[in-house]
Each structure stands twice: as structure tokens, then as C-alpha cells.
């Protein structure tokens, strides 16, 4: 009869400083299907090392080990895990149950890595627990079970994928005598069903119940009686779980790992909340500062635009403060007409101004009287609360009409509902009111100067008696570069005057400077917020590093149930909060930032607080990457461990 497990000259050594310590010394052993074998020996004899090699948790340094005729030395880590999963079931002295899973869920674990569908897993787990007398304990957690019940759960787990070979490491060592007898009775039943049972023990009473007792001493077999010729294999032990594709195993394991992650979060609510708090605060800080900072920037830019954006002012002289008489009359009405004909000009308005007294009945105030064209209000984005601007007929006829600002309207006509049509004195000239320009609300503050506007032809011809302009304001068409327009304007007037006796002031340059300044400030504030996010990420990293490091012990790495290195990797990475926790924290942080923004909107109604999808996405990705980076690395290191090293940590 061909042996099920065949070992020839197996040697296993471990480094100890500069030397190699040989633990197994030429072990040759055959174990047949359906046998119940006990391996006995004192502590340090090598029996546990032999068990690990038998169960494909470790590889021999030299020698040949065949399982059902297959040489395990030719298999890689994942293929070895598959062989282990399909042929072996482990029963440990300390049970190695997952504390946050129920008895039923613990039994299901081996089938998760075999790719079995959830419904099939559930039915199989319930069947096994019922067979072992735990049908009323399926929803109990390990802490709610006695030692004997926990060991029965571990036996059911060992049988989940068929368990052709049951390896029991001191199965009664942590149990009282009654529970120990129950466990041994179950092992006898498994033998009767056709399972091969290998018991590793130092208890002679337990070993005596086996059909064959193999004794090992100092790494060598000192007693190895022959196998019994007639072995009961009537039951057969074909694997319950059929081999499935790697992709199906991955998808099944991935889904189950995410489910386990949520269970882990729910089982430790306070720790979960405290761990997420750093991420929540960091995300909320980043998003809130970006959103509020952008709103503040838009507010400032709106104020700049209210002054007149995309405009170029032309003044006589070399620069501000130049009062040289030869330059005061540099700008003429013909210059205005020439500028208005340029293709890049949306509108152009002249300006002549003088401080005058305004009178209505017994009210007398000082104001700045400005001669402008009807386009002036469009250039500066001003609107009217009453009436309208000048028309071309009024400009050509030097009409005695005037537009008031809201401050003058309030002082001259405090009790009138409609002032259009009223007549006031501008200096000594009577003028009819045709409109009231709406006051511009600005976070930069409103001007204290009272202003009125008259047609520039009226101002220069009837009031001031001058034929030149104090300034010209040009609004550049949308789509034209303001800097290029300024160059063309300078070239045009220089050619007309034969010299450069004027200077320009481009508001677009001011706007760009303000934008650059606000961007710098916003970047600074964002960096401050990012620091808080990094601090929160470091806290999460610490928790995850500790969690993953702690969970590389055998009771949390499923290598003992046949998970390969790739499955251990995503088991640790996805099952624990390494991905779920930062993602949830990021979502809660974004929610908190939305609440903060809406609250600010109530207290700052003038601010247009909007949310950038890019900012929200980047903040969320940042928190998720934190979990990926600081969860993946420890999980990868854990996946590279040999199963026997993992078991040794317990």
C-alpha cells in the first residue's frame, strides 16, 4: 500500500549565531491513509518541528517529503498553501480562534481562502458544528465558550475543507479531563470516518489511544512500529471544497476581508473613533481652509473687479504726481475717438473732474463732479437703483443732466421716494437728476467722497471751460490679453502725440498681483492644515503598525488554515482598519467640513462658499493613501514570514 505521507532522510537545521543547529536528523517515516498515529517525545525533541513539516507549514533543509506522491520541495509558497489547505486540518492546544468572529464564522475561515461561496460555507459550518454538538453555540464568540467547546470549534474548522489529514498539537493540553476525553472521542470518530489523525503529544495516556506510537528523541526516531495492515478507510476523505480559480479565490477573500474589517470596527467602537479622530480633524481642516480660503479670495477679487477690472487708465504726464503744465493738456477728445475705434476696445470713457458745491433747497454739500461718457458705468460694473445713464444725444448736446451716487441722494433727498427729474445746482449750473448709481458694497470699504457724474461734454464745456481730458479709461474686450492691449494703446497714443507724454495704469496687473498674493496665503493655510492631516496620519500609522504587527501571531494570520502569502497580504491589509478606517475617517472629515462651511454661510451671507470636487477628492484620497501606505507595508512584511515563524510568535 502506498503511504499517504512519506518522509525520507528529512533533516531540519536552524542558524544559531555562526553555527547551524540540527533539530531533525535523518527522519524516515511512512504514514498511511486512515491511520491514527501519535508522535511522542520530550520538550525539545523535535516533534513540533516534525509536525510543522508534515503539515506543510515548514520545509525540510534536506531530504524528501511526499504528500500523496507529490514532492513538496517542488512547490512554491502559494502551491504549498493550497496543498496544505486541501489535505490538512490543524488542531492547536490554544485553539487559535479569531476573537471577534463567532464560532460559525471561525469555522468558515478555511473555506474563504478556498473560494467557496458564502452560502455553501455557511451550510458546511453549521453541519460540522451540529455534528460536534455545538448547534446551539453557532453565534457565540470564543470568549463565551468553554475550553472544550473552543477546541471542538477548532476541530470543525480543521474539517471545513475536508481535513484528509488531521494534525492535533497537544489537543487536550489546555483542557480538563472530561473535556479532554470528549476531544479524544471526536478524534476516534474522525479516524473511523477515514481521516488520518496525527497527534503530537507528550502525554502517554493520550498517545496510548493511537494505533501506532512513534517516539522521537533528540531529533531522531527511536521507536516506529509498523503500520497496522487493516485500516478503516470506509468513509473516504475527498476534499469538500473543489479547487477554484485564483481569481475566484481572490474575489471571495477580498469580499470576506472587507466584511471582517467592518466587524473589527464595530467590535472596538471607542478605539475606532479615537483612531479616526486625527484623520477627521485633518481632513476637515484641509477641506474647510481650502473652501473658506477660496471664498475669501473670490470676495477680494470681486472687490477688485468692482473697481474696474480688465481696464486701462490713461493719465497725462510721466507718472503720478507729475504736475508739469506742458503735460496737463496731453489727452484730447480726438484721442478718445481714436481709442474707441480699436478692435480690442469694448468701451472707453473720458474723465474730467472738479470739486464743486451741490445745493438743493437749503442743503449744501461738497462733492467731486466727474465728466464721463455713458459707458463709464459699464466700464466700472456699476448699476442703477433709479433712472439710467446718459445717452448719445445728451452727450452731443452738452445736456445739463446729472447722475448722483447713493450717498448724495441720501443727503439731498432724505425723504423722497423718487428723485429722477429733480433739479439741483452743480456749482452754479442747474442740472436735472436722471439717475442714481447703486452704492457698491465692498469688503475694502466704500469711498467717503461724494460723487456726481455729468456728460463729459457738459463738464468740460459748461462747467470747467477746458478742451482737454484729465484721464481716459479703456475697457478691454473679453478674450484679448490686457498686457498686449496696453502695449497697443501706448503705441497708438505715442504715434498720435509724437512723444510719450502720458502713462497708463493697468488694473489687470493689480488683479493678478492680488490673485498671486491670495494664492500664496491660501497655500500657506493649506500647508498648515496638511500638517494636522499628517499628524493624524502618523497616529493612524502607529495604530495600524501595532495592529498588523500584533496580528501576525498565529491566531490572526490564517496560514494555519491554508492561506498563501498573497492571501495573508490582503487578509491583513483589508481585514483590519488599514484601508477601511482612513476611508471612513476621510468621509466623516469631509462631512464635518461641509457642516462647517454651511454654518459659515449662515454667519457670512456675503461669502460665496462653494466646494471644489478636486479638493474633496484629494482630501479623501490623502486619507485613503495613508491607510494604504501604512497598512500595506506591515502587511507585506507579515506575508513574507514563514508560517512556522508565525506560529512561534504565539
Swiss-Prot record:
Highest taxon above the source species: Bacteria
SMART domains: AAA
GO biological process: response to antibiotic
Domain ABC transporter: 5-243
Binding annotation for ATP: 41-48
Stated role: Part of the tripartite efflux system MacAB-TolC. MacB is a non-canonical ABC transporter that contains transmembrane domains (TMD), which form a pore in the inner membrane, and an ATP-binding domain (NBD), which is responsible for energy generation. Confers resistance against macrolides.
Protein name in the entry: Macrolide export ATP-binding/permease protein MacB
